Curated annotation (Swiss-Prot):
Protein name: Small ribosomal subunit protein uS14
A GO CC annotation given for this chain: cytoplasm
One of the Pfam families matching this protein, by short name: Ribosomal_S14
Biological role stated in the UniProt entry: Binds 16S rRNA, required for the assembly of 30S particles and may also be responsible for determining the conformation of the 16S rRNA at the A site.
Gene3D superfamilies: 1.10.287.1480
Any one GO MF annotation of this record: structural constituent of ribosome
InterPro entries tied to this protein: Ribosomal_uS14, Ribosomal_uS14_bac/plastid, Ribosomal_uS14_CS
Superkingdom of the source species: Bacteria
Organism from which the protein derives: Bacteroides thetaiotaomicron (strain ATCC 29148 / DSM 2079 / JCM 5827 / CCUG 10774 / NCTC 10582 / VPI-5482 / E50)
Keywords per UniProt: Ribonucleoprotein, Ribosomal protein, RNA-binding, rRNA-binding
An example Gene Ontology biological process: translation
Length: 99
């Protein structure tokens, strides 16, 4: 089980990413396609944005336990929680494989 502070940190990062997404995208577009002087200025502004507003810094975590590894994107939980919930029949449409 992850510490509550780690879960809170990820939530805080997600909020920052959402808040600065449009501004970051606009600046990156200028850096890619603008004139060199404008591109340099946009790059400087991009560096002034908060470090945690970069989506690369976000990490997928299990919604139930906060576990960072073994994350299954389709369900948003870790492999351990997935197995436990599937065994108990808590995930609709999931059953053990047999062939």
């Amino acid at each position: 089980m992850a510490k509550e502070s780690m879960k809170a940190r990820e939530v805080k990062r997600a909020k920052l990413v959402a808040r600065y997404a449009e501004k970051r995208a606009a600046l990156k577009q200028i850096v890619r396609t603008g004139e060199p002087a404008d591109a340099f200025e946009a790059a400087q502004k991009l560096q002034e944005l908060p470090k945690n507003s970069n989506p690369i810094r976000m990490h997928n975590r299990c919604k139930l336990t906060g576990r960072p590894k073994g994350y299954i994107r389709q369900f948003g939980i870790s492999r351990i929680q997935f197995r436990e919930m599937a065994s108990n029949g808590l995930i609709p449409g999931v059953k053990k494989a047999s062939w």
